Regions:
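N-terminal ligand-binding/catalytic initiation module
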Residues: 1-155, 375, 381, 388-389
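Short, ordered loop/turn segments at secondary-structure junctions
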Residues: 69-71, 79, 108-109, 134-137, ...
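Glycine-rich phosphate/diphosphate-binding loop of Rossmann-like nucleotide-binding domains
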Residues: 74, 79-99, 157, 161, ...
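General beta-strand structural signal in soluble alpha/beta enzymes
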Residues: 105, 131-134, 155-158, 189, ...
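Adenosine-phosphate binding glycine-rich loop
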Residues: 158-159, 178-180, 282-390
Length: 390
């Protein structure tokens, strides 16, 4: 199938992938008076007395805003807010289909961090959660941090945390397949954008000890010239031996490669220099850092990509619907590291040790267990860590 042509036809036919539906009937004078004036004044007064009643008397309890500035849309780059709308609509469809979450797309016309933050904060009272989407790094880190400080609802940048959750889940099972321990393996990442940094942070939180990040200039280490503030922050907690060199240099003897960077950055020869039973997560889309057949030829044991036409797809739809479902179910005030790690552990646990193989380390997107299992784990973690409000 030519997905580009067929998708364009679908969008022309439907003129959008979402719509607003009423949950109550308006077919009589009494219906109208209850749904709107004069009856609607009473729930307004209840919410005025206690704003938390907005979760009980409106759709806020299940409503997520999917918000972008259009600056880093898929692999298309800075295409602007209007052009980002099809992706935001698509995200809303996935929220509903896989998590039962009502989501609404919002494309904001500003690249100014404070203006974006204030805009989102000003409308946050209408929503139970905020999903940030397709915002360029390093601006996305500052936006998320500031919104988390200001808002009392979950703020979650899926390009960071959804990818990190799935990666941790897949890597947990991949290590079982090859019989290695997270505390001992050497992990090398390619890329230092939103996804890579969040992946590394979550791996460190989960107990991985030996991680080196690489960008276009090679290994990132404390004291390297030209690092921006977020790379300096990561340099303080990774590559503690402060080794320089290229990506190829960093991969020598490494156990795990995680790529969220650019096509073709890894060769068969580079994989051959890695430790035995190497694990390769080549997640650049649509063309990975190295194709699975080349990685296999180089000696890799377990290989994952971001593509659906190869085994072990890293697909964020495995995470964000269930994460928000779980957060909403307990009216969480935040989505913290413990909740993300719980989501990853739940995903990994859906595949039994007997089922695990080199080509089956991550559940399939349409596995009906995924959403409910992730949601339950996230809700439990929210309760344990004091984020739950009901």
């Amino acid at each position: 199938m030519n997905y580009a042509e067929e998708s364009l036809k679908l969008h022309r036919r439907w003129r959008g992938k979402i719509e607003v539906n009423a949950t109550v009937p308006v077919s009589s004078k009494d219906d109208l008076s209850l749904a709107y004036t004069p009856g609607v004044a009473q729930p307004c007064l209840e919410i005025q007395k206690d704003p938390a009643q907005s979760y009980e008397l409106t759709r806020r309890h299940n409503l997520c805003a999917v918000i972008t500035d259009g600056s880093a849309v898929l692999g298309l780059g800075d295409i602007g807010p209007e052009a980002g709308m099809p992706v935001m609509e698509g995200k809303c469809v996935l929220f509903k289909a896989f998590g039962g979450v009502d989501a609404f797309p919002l494309c904001v016309r500003t690249k100014d961090v404070d203006e974006f933050v204030q805009t989102v904060y000003n409308i946050s009272g209408s929503f139970g959660g905020i999903n940030l989407e397709d915002i360029a790094a390093p601006r996305c880190f500052e936006i998320e941090r500031k919104l988390k400080e200001k808002c009392d609802i979950p703020v979650f940048h899926d390009d960071q945390h959804g990818t990190a959750i799935i990666t941790l889940a897949g890597l947990t099972n991949a290590l079982k397949v090859v019989g290695k321990k997270k505390e001992e393996v050497r992990v090398v990442t390619s890329g230092a954008g939103a996804a890579a940094i969040s992946i590394v942070k979550l791996l460190l939180s989960a107990g991985f000890r030996h991680v080196t990040m690489c960008d276009r200039k090679g290994a990132i280490y404390q004291g390297r010239e030209g690092l921006n503030w977020i790379k300096e922050e990561m340099a303080a907690v990774t590559n503690l031996e402060r080794k320089g060199g290229s990506l190829a240099d960093a991969l020598v003897g490494a156990d795990v490669f995680i790529g969220v960077s650019a096509p073709g950055t890894v060769t068969r020869e580079m994989v051959q220099t890695m430790n035995h039973d190497a694990i390769i997560f080549a997640c650049a889309n649509p063309t990975p850092e190295i194709f699975p057949d080349e990685a296999k030829a180089g000696g890799a044991r377990v290989i994952s990509t971001g593509r659906s036409d190869y085994p072990n797809q890293i697909n964020n739809v495995l995470a964000f619907p269930g994460v928000f479902r779980g957060a909403f179910d307990v009216r969480a005030s935040d989505i913290n590291e413990e909740m993300k790690m719980a989501a990853a552990a739940a995903l990994a646990g859906l595949i039994s040790d007997e089922e695990l193989t080199e080509e089956y380390i991550i559940p399939k997107a349409f596995d009906p267990r995924v959403g409910p299992t992730v949601a339950a784990a996230v809700a439990d973690a929210a309760r344990r860590t004091g984020e739950a409000r009901i």
